[in-house]
C-alpha cells in the first residue's frame, strides 16, 4: 500500500465538531470498535456517524445489512408507538405573552424617539424589525425549554428533534409566532404576525403571510433556472481539468490557519507540503501524507496554528491537476485516481447546492435580519480601553450613537471598590461597536459592545424611503444639515443633506393661492377672520362683446365675442330627411352648398364647413383619370379630401364600366372579348349600361370582375403599328396618324387588344372636363379688427382621384369637389369658432349663418371649497352685452383668512409667483410658565424634555418665539431626522401641507437573508463582476495620512509609499474611511468601506509586488493572494446558508479563472501584445529568451469570469459549444487554430472516447508506447497530447513491468512502413528531426540529461510558435 493511503487502523469515523460522542483522539483507535451509543439518544447525527463508521471499517455489505436491521428496528417501534400529531400536541409556551409585551414596550419607546426627531424613519423601521426578530429568537428558546421540561415525549417535539420531519423554524410557526413577513418587493413589513397557527391568524395576518408563500413558489421556479445555468458555466470552465499526473513536484503550497485552535474538516484529505513539527521539534506529520481525522486531531492537539498543504491552486501540472495536489477523492476518502475528471466534480459540487438553496427558501416564510455578537457586562465596574485602542464616533442602524473600534484591542471591566474580583475581558475586533465610554462606570448586564466576527460581508443594497410630512407648516433646516446642490448627468439639480440633522416643520395654517393670485398683505401683519389675504383677477385677452351664460356646476362661463362674421349673401335653408336635419346654403345666384356642420357646433381653423354640389363634374360610370399637361395638384394628399388643385387645366376621362362580381362562372351569359350592346345581360340579373368590348376576370372558376370598354375595334396585323401602343393604352392627340383609314378629329385613347380571333386596336373616346384656376364663388367676406384674430372663408377645389387612377364602378363618380373652409389668423389654440344660425336683420323669415370667435372665461362661484384655499369671494365686473377692451378685468376673486393670526410669506425667488402663504394661529403656539431665568434663546428649537429654565422642562417640540420674565412662547413643530446624503424635496422656509414629501432618505440595508441573495452573490464572484461603488484600495504599501479639510466634512486621504511618493486618493462623499492616521497598509488593502473589485485587487497586489520581486514571482504571488480571497468569499456565501462545500472544489474553479496573463510588451518573443496566454507558457518562453539572450515578454495577470474563461479556452470546439458559436468558430478559422482534444467536451462532440476514467489509461499507455524509451517527450504537451488526435482511442497497450530499453521489448512496435507513412503524413525528415517517436528506438541514442537544455521544452515552444526557429 502506498504511503499516501492511511492504514485501516487509523481510520475512525469522522466526528463532527459539536458531536458529543467520545473523541477518537482521547480513545485508543481500535479497528473494530463501533462508536459508543450506550444510554444516549441516537438522533440523525449519531446515526450518520454509526453508518459512516460501519462503512469505513467493514465495507458495503456489512453496512447494508446493518442499515436494514436499523430500519426494521425503527419500523417496529414506530408501529408500536403510533406517534401521531393532534391539535392538543401544539402547546404554546406561557412566556409568549410576556415576551410580546416586552417587545411592544421597546417599540413604543422607539416610536417616541422618532416623534422627537432623535432617529430617522429608516432607523425606526430597522429598530422595530430587529426588536421583533430578537423577540422571535427568544420565543424559539422558550418553545424549546417548554417542550424539554414539561413534555419531552410530545409528538411534535420528537419529530422535529429527531430530524424525522420538520425543523425548529416550522415548530416555531406552529406554537411560537409566525414572525416578520416580507412584502412582494422583498421589504420587510414592520408589523409582524404575532399569532401562530395554533392560535390562528387574523384576516390581515393571513393575507400578509400568503404573500410570502406565493413568492416562495415563484422564486423556486425562477431560481432553479439560475442555478442550472450557473452549473452549466462551471462545467464548461472546468471540464478539461483531469488528474493526469502522479506528482507535479511543485514546491509551492497554501497555508491553512486554525480557527480558534480548530481546523475542523479543512485539512481532511489534503497532503502536507512539508514536515510538520510541534513546539518541541518532534515530527507530527511527515511531508506528502494525507491528513485523516486522527492526524487532524493530533495537529490540533500539538496546538499548531498554520499548516502548509498542497492544493490544486499551486499545482504545476500542465492543464490538469496531479494526484498529490488534489488529495483525497471525497467519494471514497482515498487518494484520487489518475484520469478522474475532477473539474466536472468540482463544478457539480458548487452548482448543485445552488438548486438546493433555492428550494430552501420558503419553508419558514419569515425573513430575518438579526444582529449578532452582542456582549453584555457580567459584573459591575469601570470600563478601561487598552492603550492602543482607537475609536471613532459611529451611528448604528438603530440611531444609537456609539463608538466604532478602528483597531483590535482588549476592553476590561474592572470591579470597583468593595466588590473585587476578576475583571471581565472583552476582545474587540476592528469594526466592532462599543456602547460605553473609556472610564465609564457601568452595572452588570449592560450591553457593552457588538463584536463583528471577521469580515462577514452581508450583501447590502442601497434603498430609499420617503419622509412624509404629518402637519402643515413652514420648513426650517438645522444648521448642521449643510444642504448642497448636486447636479446629475441629466442636469437636474437636487438638494442633498451632507450631515445628519433635523428638518423641522413649524405649525401654521397654509393657504394655496390660485394660479393668478397675488398676496395683498405683507409678511408679519396680524390678520383677523375675513381679512383679504390675496386677490386674483381674470381679464379678457382680446376684448369684445360680453355674453353671460347660465352657470354650470360651481362655475359660470363668461363668453366674450372677439370676432363675428355673418354670411349675408347666403340663405340658410333647413331640410328634414329621414337621417336628420340637413342644412344648405343658397347664394343669391342659386348655387347651393351643402353644410357639413350644424349650427351650435364648434369648429377649428382650416376645417371645411360646406361643399359645393356641382353636377358639371359628375360622370355616368367609372373609368380612368388622366391629367392633361398644365393641370397640377399640390403634393400633400389628405386622403379623405383628395388633392388640392394648384393650377387649373383639363382633366381627361376615359369611361369604362366595371362590375365587381363574386359568383360562379356558370352564371356568365356572354363571351370574353366580345362586343356587346348597352342593356345586354352579362351575368344573371346584371345588365351592361354601355356598349363596348367585354373583359372577364376569373380565378378558380369564380367570376371576379366584368369590364365593359366602349369604343371602336380595328383589326390590324402590322407589327410596327401595334408596337406603338401598349395594352395599358396611350393617348393620341387630334390629327395624329393611328391606322390607315382612321381619321381622328378628337383625342382618343388607344389600346392594343388580342381577341380570340385576331389582333387589333381599340379606339376609345375621351371626355374632357375643364377645371378653372380658382373656384367660381360669390363674393366672400373677411372680417378684420384692430386686435385679435381675423376670420375669413376660402374656397378650395379638390380632385378626388390621382393621375392614372382607375375607378372601378358602375355608377358615376364626382371628379371635382369645391370646399368652403374657414380661415382665421392669429387665433390661439384655445379659441374655437362657433357656428350659429341667426335671423336676418331686415327679413325675419330668412336665416343667416354666423361664425363667431369666442374667448371663454370660467369664473368660480363663491364656495367654501377645499380648505387649503381658504374661503373665497368672487365678483363679476361686467354686464351682459357690454363691450370690453383687451386686458379689462372680468372678475376678481378674494381669498379670505379663516382664523386670526400672523401672516408669513415664503422666501421669494425673483419672477416666481407666490403660490402659498401661511397664517400662524393661536393654536399653533403654546406658552410655558417659568419662575427663574430662561436658559434658551429666541430661535432655539427644543423637543419634549429639553430644559427651558433651570426648573422647567419643555412639554412639546417647537421653536422659541418670545421670552418674557414669566413665560416662554413656543411655536409648535415637528422634527424629522435626516441622514447624510438624503435628497431634500423642500428648501429652507418652504411651506408644506400635510402629506407632502419632505425628503428621500438614502440608506444601506442588508438584503433579506436567503440564498436568493446567495446565488447572485456567487454568480457575481465567479463571473468576477465589477461591483458598483466599490471600495478604494491602496495601490501600494505605505503609511496612511488623513488630513481634515477646512470644513469638517472634507477629508483627504493619502498613502506615503516606500520612496516617499505620496499617493492621494479621491474620496466620495458618504464613504467611511476604514483606516486610521499613521496606520501601515499593504497593497490591496481597503481604505474605505464598500464591496471589493477583484480586478482592482489583483492589480494592486501585482503592482505592489513587482517592485520587490521578479515579474514571474510577483504574478504568482499576487494571483495566489487573490485566489485565497476568492475561495474564502465563495465559501462565506455557502457557509452563511449552512452548506458545506470542500475547499478543493472551489480551488479547482478559481484556478481556471486565474490561469491566464495578458501580454503587455512582447519583447523579442513571438507573442502579441494584448494576447491572453497561460502563465506557464509565458514562463517557458521567457526562460528560453534568457537562454538565447532576447528581451523577455512583460505581462500582467488577469482574472477572467467563468463565462470569459470558458470562451478563452484552448479548445475552440468546447468554447463554440458553450456560447457565441459563430464568433468563436470564425475567429478560430481566421487564426487557423487546432484543437488538441484534451477535454471531455471536445471528445464527446466529435464522438471519441473521453480521456477520463477508463478512457484515460489507454490514452496514457498509447502515448508511452509510442514514446518508446524517451518518456520525456510526454512531459510537454507539444509532443504528447498533440499526437493524441491520431490515436485510435479504442485499444490499449499493456506496458511490460520491467523498464526495458531494448527495442524488442516494446510490444506494439511500429513496422518500418508504419514509421515511413507516419513521417510522410507529418512531412518529417528523419535526419533533421529529433522526434524520438518517429525514429527507430535503440539503446545507444540516449543523452545524459544535463548536456542540453531540455529538448522537449524547446521543441514544444517551437511547435506552439512561441519561439522562432533559431
Curated annotation (Swiss-Prot):
Domain of life: Bacteria
Positions annotated to bind Zn(2+): 248, 315, 322, 325
Transcription in keyword set: yes
GO biological processes: DNA-templated transcription
Keyword Nucleotidyltransferase in annotation: yes
Ranges of compositional bias, category Polar residues: 1295-1305
Basic residues: compositionally biased ranges: 1-20
Catalytic activity annotation: RNA(n) + a ribonucleoside 5'-triphosphate = RNA(n+1) + diphosphate
A Pfam entry, by short name: RNA_pol_Rpb1_4
A GO MF label: DNA binding
Gene Ontology cellular component list: DNA-directed RNA polymerase complex
SUPFAM superfamilies, A to Z: beta and beta-prime subunits of DNA dependent RNA-polymerase
Record keywords: DNA-directed RNA polymerase, Metal-binding, Nucleotidyltransferase, Transcription, Transferase, Zinc
Enzyme Commission no: 2.7.7.6
Stretch list, region Disordered: 1-34, 1291-1366
Cofactor: Zn(2+)
Cofactor info, note text: Binds 1 Zn(2+) ion per subunit.
Name of the top EC class for this enzyme: transferase
Subunit structure: In cyanobacteria the RNAP catalytic core is composed of 2 alpha, 1 beta, 1 beta', 1 gamma and 1 omega subunit. When a sigma factor is associated with the core the holoenzyme is formed, which can initiate transcription.
HAMAP family: RNApol_bact_RpoC2 (MF_01324)
Alphabetized NCBIfam families for the sequence: PRK02597.1, rpoC2_cyan
Family per record: Belongs to the RNA polymerase beta' chain family. RpoC2 subfamily.
Protein name: DNA-directed RNA polymerase subunit beta'
Organism: Prochlorococcus marinus (strain MIT 9301)
